[in-house]
Amino acid sequence: FGWGKNRAALKAKKAAYEAEVHSYEKSVLEAFKETRNAIVNFNKIKEVYELRANLERSAKSYMDLAQLQYINGVINYLDVLDAQRGYFDAQIGLSNAIRDELIAVVQLYKALGGGWEQNP
């Protein structure tokens, strides 16, 4: 007989098994958390994109209106330049929102486990 060797080995195997189960559960929970965070982030960034797109359209309309008013002598050229600056700022904001949205899509895709290769 093994004087308790077998029993000690069984306890060690059970402890190792429970540690692996705990590690697996922790990994699964972390994956769900990353996925949820990526989805929330994507939705927020999509809202920002929509707001920036609306702002860009409004700034374009304002710039067009300012140009017409200048042509008709209602406003001076500095007002047109100010409207153009606002439009260009809105375009930059929209470009940044598009970039952020694309980055969020990649992060979501990675969180879902897609397209990741360690050694391409």
Give short role names for the model-derived ranges.
Residues 1-2, 32:
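Outer-membrane beta-barrel channels and translocator barrels
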Residues 3-7:
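Short loop/turn motifs that connect adjacent beta-strands in outer-membrane beta-barrel proteins
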Residues 8-93, 100-111:
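Amphipathic alpha-helical coiled-coil segments
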Residues 111-120:
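Terminal intrinsically disordered/low-complexity segments used for targeting and assembly
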